[in-house]
Amino acid sequence: MSVNPHQFPRPGEVFLDHAGIFVDEFERSGSMLERLGFTMTPFRAHSSALRPGDPLTPLGTGNRCAMLREGFIEVLGPTADTPMAAQLRASLARYPGLHLIAFSGTDPEARHAALAAAGLDPAPISRIERTQATSDGDQEIRASIV
């Protein structure tokens, strides 16, 4: 899959990146989306490094994604007993479905500070790393989550 160059924001821009749907059953949810015509990625367990260069540790969550021309719909669920999975399960206990809207920007520290200055209480910035198979070979993906 080629990357749309307009999918990445320029400095100062913020884009809608993806929506996240929380589910209990990846296969059932993924199969349903495939029947609706979406191209789904294989299941991927999430892992993260506490600091850049640290070893990756499992987060206890995973996903499948319905890929769109620009962005994607992320189908997330718990896979183990971890703090991140407990947070996801608490959201699922309220209701399964849309719980996450993710935006792309270029300066996570500035965005975090702006959210706090606006009176919100953002969680600490999380950093994720993973290897993603692409048509050009494996690529390291790094992201910050505000």
Q: What role is predicted for each listed range?
A:
Residues 27-46, 81, 93, 107-126:
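Extended intrinsically disordered, low-complexity coil regions enriched in Ser, Thr, Gly, Ala
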Residues 2-4, 8, 15-25, 59-69, 87-115, ...:
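Vicinal oxygen chelate
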Residues 5, 11-12, 94:
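Generic signal for short, ordered secondary-structure residues
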Residues 3-7, 85-90:
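Short amphipathic alpha-helical segments, especially helix-boundary/capping motifs
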Residues 39-89, 138-146:
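Conserved short beta-strand elements that form part of the metal-binding/catalytic scaffold
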Residues 10, 14-50, 67:
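N-terminal ordered "arm"
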